[in-house]
Amino acid sequence: MPAFNRLLPLASLVLIYWVRVCFPVCVEVPSETEAVQGNPMKLRCISCMKREEVEATTVVEWFYRPEGGKDFLIYEYRNGHQEVESPFQGRLQWNGSKDLQDVSITVLNVTLNDSGLYTCNVSREFEFEAHRPFVKTTRLIPLRVTEEAGEDFTSVVSEIMMYILLVFLTLWLFIEMIYCYRKVSKAEEAAQENASDYLAIPSENKENSVVPVEE
């Protein structure tokens, strides 16, 4: 039985790894919306297919709208990568997956003028025997570019919660130590009182307190 308990966690890890390799899971994770000037910025666009075994013709279009402006095409994927003429020319890099569920792009050397609204359009035409349905999904990414990296609010909250938890655990441990100390002290005092009471009994009473054994 102990050997089985040791092998069970290992078998679970192997099973999880096998499932992840054999049955990859697509998760539509939203993109980050803040970038730092001069750094690369990945614009994440994920459009999962409910039935991955079905073949589909996929077309991806990336649009950019500056503040107070109109949308214009900056990148297109149609039977291959195609970067169109735009202010982003030479600074866009394809960062998608082979199955075209992840169709993200990366903006290199981000500038302050790159702030604005990015639109990711994914058009799919599925190939069935009877019909060819068409599905289109859209992802909007409002990007804000700053000169310097600001402190992440999520990390600040996580750090504060970590310190609060640490203080709580310290207080709890301190209270448990006091409780255990008092419990042990009371047990020792009770033992000493019993010993003192026994010693205070006269020797005659001790002899009389012995119960005779019937023959």
Curated annotation (Swiss-Prot):
Residue span, Ig-like C2-type domain: 25-138
Coiled-coil ranges per UniProt: none
GO MF: sodium channel inhibitor activity; sodium channel regulator activity; transmembrane transporter binding; voltage-gated sodium channel activity involved in cardiac muscle cell action potential
Cross-referenced Pfam families: V-set (PF07686)
Record InterPro entries: Ig-like_dom, Ig-like_dom_sf, Ig-like_fold, Ig_sub, Ig_V-set, Na_channel_b1/b3
Membrane topology: Single-pass type I membrane protein
Entry comment on modification after translation: Intramolecular disulfide bonds favor the voltage-gated sodium channel oligomeric complex assembly.
GO biological process, one term: nervous system development
Sequence ranges on the Cytoplasmic membrane side: 179-215
Signal peptide positions on this chain: 1-24
Transmembrane residue ranges: 157-178
GO terms under cellular component: cytosol; intracellular membrane-bounded organelle; plasma membrane; voltage-gated sodium channel complex; Z disc
The entry's keywords: Cell membrane, Disulfide bond, Glycoprotein, Immunoglobulin domain, Ion channel, Ion transport, Membrane, Signal, Sodium, Sodium channel, Sodium transport, Transmembrane, Transmembrane helix, Transport, Voltage-gated channel
Glycosylation sites: N95, N109, N113, N121
Disulfide bonds: C26-C48, C45-C120
Topology feature Extracellular, residues: 25-156
Gene3D superfamilies: Immunoglobulins
Tissue specificity remark: Expressed broadly in neurons in the central and peripheral nervous systems, but not in glia and most non-neuronal cells. Weak detection in lung and adrenal gland.
Protein's cellular compartments: Cell membrane
Database matches in PANTHER family: SODIUM CHANNEL SUBUNIT BETA-1 AND 3 (PTHR10546), SODIUM CHANNEL SUBUNIT BETA-3 (PTHR10546:SF1)
Subunit structure: A voltage-gated sodium (Nav) channel consists of an ion-conducting pore-forming alpha subunit functional on its own that is regulated by one or more beta subunits. Forms homodimers and homotrimers. SCN3B is non-covalently associated with alpha subunits and induces the formation of alpha subunit oligomers, including trimers. Interacts with SCN5A/Nav1.5; regulatory subunit of SCN5A/Nav1.5. Interacts with SCN7A/Nav2.1; probable regulatory subunit of SCN7A/Nav2.1. Interacts with SCN10A; regulatory subunit of SCN10A/Nav1.8.
Similarity annotation: Belongs to the sodium channel auxiliary subunit SCN3B (TC 8.A.17) family.
Function: Regulatory subunit of multiple voltage-gated sodium (Nav) channels directly mediating the depolarization of excitable membranes. Navs, also called VGSCs (voltage-gated sodium channels) or VDSCs (voltage-dependent sodium channels), operate by switching between closed and open conformations depending on the voltage difference across the membrane. In the open conformation they allow Na(+) ions to selectively pass through the pore, along their electrochemical gradient.
Protein name: Sodium channel regulatory subunit beta-3
